Amino acid sequence: MAQIPARGNYSRQLTCKQAGDAWEAAARRWLESKGLRFIAANVRVRGGEIDLIMRDGKTTVFVEVRYRRSGLYGGAAASVTRSKQHKLLHTAHLWLARQNGSFDTVDCRFDVLAFTGNEIEWFRDAFNDHS
């Protein structure tokens, strides 16, 4: 697994894909330490991708993982735009349909796990299908 340096220029140390995979792995471990159970990672369907799908009790949690070196331009959480939210909602809708579910039949939420520098922020229920 790629090492995540505390500071530094990822372009010199890791490819963008490797850095993304490393942050997603760190997010998974962190969420598991908080009691969530892993279901899937990097779920791709036509039109989008979900970084992590976890379970929190009976709730299916779709997780967007974001990293920014600093909060200078709003930090990691600010990078989850309305457009990105719509893509995540669409992707989750298609994934649920493949599982014979829907937003009406499955208790679910959308979380954002934001790494800004060395800080982690967990935004539970950051947005929903009514946003």
Swiss-Prot record:
<dbReference type="InterPro" id="IPR003509">
    <property type="entry name" value="UPF0102_YraN-like"/>
</dbReference>
<dbReference type="InterPro" id="IPR011335">
    <property type="entry name" value="Restrct_endonuc-II-like"/>
</dbReference>
<dbReference type="InterPro" id="IPR011856">
    <property type="entry name" value="tRNA_endonuc-like_dom_sf"/>
</dbReference>
<comment type="similarity">
    <text>Belongs to the UPF0102 family.</text>
</comment>
<dbReference type="Pfam" id="PF02021">
    <property type="entry name" value="UPF0102"/>
</dbReference>
<dbReference type="GO" id="GO:0003676">
    <property type="term" value="F:nucleic acid binding"/>
</dbReference>
<protein>
    <recommendedName>
        <fullName>UPF0102 protein YraN</fullName>
    </recommendedName>
</protein>
